[in-house]
């Protein structure tokens, strides 16, 4: 959900900028239907400085829904003013033209950065390293609906790590750390399995020099915020029951078959 919210915010600001509109973040009955609890609903504000947000929001305005999971060029070009956008909007194309502003909005809060810098110092700097790899494994909800969002096999991570430096630490970020602690693939001292919350995990991802992402908007954003092109991603995003993910892919990243 965190990554999905980030796409929704970035696309809203991107469309507003392209059209010369003001924008705001939803906070009301419609957004309550999207997020299970208040913590999820306001996680963007818990994580980021969000310098570009506005407070005014009209729940009574009509809803404008994206046409499909693909980038909706017609919506981007012709979106009317004073509407509530509804959809996933999972493409950089919605906000590439204001990348600088989105990066400023998604700058982590100082309290978040402080803890992450302390962890980085302990795992990387104090051990004599200057670089690290961020690796994300998404499992729990993907195990429930594998034909929609399949869990990536360990072979994907093996191949991805084989393409990156072999003598630097690897942060392992996962929603199932107990599984990772028990898996022989992660037994080496090279791996540090994070048990932080997802805000601090994404912050640490953004500090990594190389990123191996899962088929997940969470690690997509962690890699995007890192701001480098040394990102390895799976070609497989959805299973046979899923959507067409073509526009979520970024050309400058490297993609592996699964």
Description of each model-found segment:
Residues 1-3, 28-33, 89-92, 138-142, ...:
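Short, solvent-exposed loop/turn segments at secondary-structure junctions
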Residues 1-5, 149-153, 197, 204, ...:
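Aromatic-acidic/polar surface patches that form glycan- and anion
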